[in-house]
């Protein structure tokens, strides 16, 4: 059986007295698209940076494809990364930006040029090789950043809120393009986002984080329909909360009996979470 594309065991990280990551355990299968979802300050970006080697964990292990990379510097880890700010080199052409990693690996010029052409075609920017970042829109710059991240055919693609700086219409279009491209290439992808709609529409699985810990890992449907904690129920989607008393096979809200599964005992006071679409 092949090892997971990425495996984290007991990963912890603190900045002084502030604990950013609390005992993170997670496995990501090859070809999966996983979203780290949570509010600002929950630890999702720190976790991505630890995976990339841009931050060093205080404890725990990180393995990629069965290889322990816990102590390796970023340059020795097998990933491409796209930042929210694009991080393109303004003095380099589009072609040179995309080829940057290939040049560092001493890829022959002809092979690098062919790869650049292939990737720009793939991200919808054919013929843009000679342009410079300042001549491109935000959406086009993000496409160039994505092409650069994919140039070396990495085993892992890391995306740090790549769409959040774009306007709403471009964001929705790029969301679908990015997901289609990921499926076509089959590259294992981890994306950080605080946008629920983004995570629910793009991810194979969602990792919901809060205060440095993982609250739930599941498919979009599992996270939405079967939240593991009150935080997940409140954070993902909209929900109505009602005071209820448990009864056999359901709960009573005021004078109304609601049939629902529960693991409590009759007579217990609980909070009933109801999605708006379930109200008739």
Residue ranges and their predicted role:
Residues 45-48, 144:
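ABC ATPase nucleotide-binding domain helices that frame the ATP-binding cleft
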Residues 33, 74-80, 84-231:
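ABC ATPase nucleotide-binding domains
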Residues 52:
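Helix-to-loop junction immediately C-terminal to a conserved catalytic motif
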Residues 253-280:
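Glycine/charge-rich catalytic "coupling/switch" loops of P-loop NTPases
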